[in-house]
């Protein structure tokens, strides 16, 4: 097992192959997370041709290059101009843990000192180049306060920028290019590969409440000039921000997941409070609109996420209600064993209960899966690792302050 507790230190670039992760003059424009259109506008604003955006995007995302001096198909004068006025800076990793089964977790410090968490889960198929799914955060904390969610109990601080969102994917790919100490310096960019095959916007926060930065980030994930991921390999999960679901359906074609967790309004109002604003009838209508678009060649489905809470939402009656609720909606149901966290008011459903629930759904004709727990040796519900690191940071700061106080007394 490799579970690392020591914060990873990132240093300024000093060599041609090192990665600059320090913003020397915070007035510089961070190009990370800019869409091709945004980057083209930036180049026009500095008196350059907009086609440079394609070149720079390829360097950043297909080669992992953040040092403009290494972008050799740019003129020397343009490289100098970019070095003076721009930067490519992902969020800073302050903590990471790697599991025996390949699961990786990072805690990032974003602007202002806030912390967000990212998790990478490899497929359990023993393939060296198999599926690797990255769970990305979109906000610092979450305002929805779902009663079973650790992140919601930490409150909401702010939205993440596109650079902070896409930077999580950039660092996850970079981690496969680095040594066992997870240093991101001295990477041979000629060997760069984008190992992450799937992205799910299921980390901290509600993605549709941070709509524009999230959509911009997903555009780059799909772009052939950047990550080139298939639209079925990029999934946005929402608790049900209905107006934005309609907006997303018009703007971007990615896979949709709904954090449902209850088959009736009374129970969902308790578990997922946003249901009081957008009840199930409205949510299901928005889901059907997303799936049944005007192009008959688009064969879409919605993934229904359903956390299994002992004695709360896991009865046979609840399963039958779920069957009736979904009706003819093309959907795959993912049952999620509850992952307890400190002071949680719920328990995990038994394995027998989960399988009985699953059988009812399967017999009704739905594809139903049970999420497998991964990374047991570094296990934590979404948001818990951030809480643990933040607690340690606060304790360390308090201890250091007590030393200073004693020295000054």
Curated annotation (Swiss-Prot):
Domain Radical SAM core intervals: 128-377
Enzyme Commission code: 2.1.1.192
Annotated cofactor note: Binds 1 [4Fe-4S] cluster. The cluster is coordinated with 3 cysteines and an exchangeable S-adenosyl-L-methionine.
One Pfam entry name: Radical_SAM
Transmembrane recorded as keyword: no
GO molecular function: 4 iron, 4 sulfur cluster binding; metal ion binding; rRNA (adenine(2503)-C2-)-methyltransferase activity; rRNA binding; tRNA (adenine(37)-C2)-methyltransferase activity; tRNA binding
Catalytic activity: adenosine(2503) in 23S rRNA + 2 reduced [2Fe-2S]-[ferredoxin] + 2 S-adenosyl-L-methionine = 2-methyladenosine(2503) in 23S rRNA + 5'-deoxyadenosine + L-methionine + 2 oxidized [2Fe-2S]-[ferredoxin] + S-adenosyl-L-homocysteine; adenosine(37) in tRNA + 2 reduced [2Fe-2S]-[ferredoxin] + 2 S-adenosyl-L-methionine = 2-methyladenosine(37) in tRNA + 5'-deoxyadenosine + L-methionine + 2 oxidized [2Fe-2S]-[ferredoxin] + S-adenosyl-L-homocysteine
Disulfide-linked positions: 135-382
Positions with a binding annotation for [4Fe-4S] cluster: 142, 146, 149
Catalytic machinery residues: 117, 382
Gene Ontology biological process: rRNA base methylation; tRNA methylation
Localization of this protein: Cytoplasm
Alphabetically ordered keywords of this record: 4Fe-4S, Cytoplasm, Disulfide bond, Iron, Iron-sulfur, Metal-binding, Methyltransferase, rRNA processing, S-adenosyl-L-methionine, Transferase, tRNA processing
Cofactor(s) needed for function: [4Fe-4S] cluster
Cellular-component GO terms for this entry: cytoplasm
Binding residues annotated for S-adenosyl-L-methionine, in chain numbering: 205-206, 237, 259-261, 339
First-tier enzyme category under EC: transferase
Source organism superkingdom: Bacteria
Keyword Thylakoid: no
InterPro entries reported for this sequence: Aldolase_TIM (IPR013785), Methyltransferase_A (IPR040072), RlmN_N (IPR048641), RNA_MTrfase_RlmN (IPR027492), rRNA_lsu_MTrfase_RlmN/Cfr (IPR004383), rSAM (IPR007197)
Entry-linked Gene3D superfamilies: 1.10.150.530, Aldolase class I
Other facts noted in the record for this chain: Reaction proceeds by a ping-pong mechanism involving intermediate methylation of a conserved cysteine residue.
Homology family: Belongs to the radical SAM superfamily. RlmN family.
Function: Specifically methylates position 2 of adenine 2503 in 23S rRNA and position 2 of adenine 37 in tRNAs. m2A2503 modification seems to play a crucial role in the proofreading step occurring at the peptidyl transferase center and thus would serve to optimize ribosomal fidelity.
Protein name: Dual-specificity RNA methyltransferase RlmN
Source organism: Psychrobacter arcticus (strain DSM 17307 / VKM B-2377 / 273-4)
Gene this chain is encoded by: rlmN
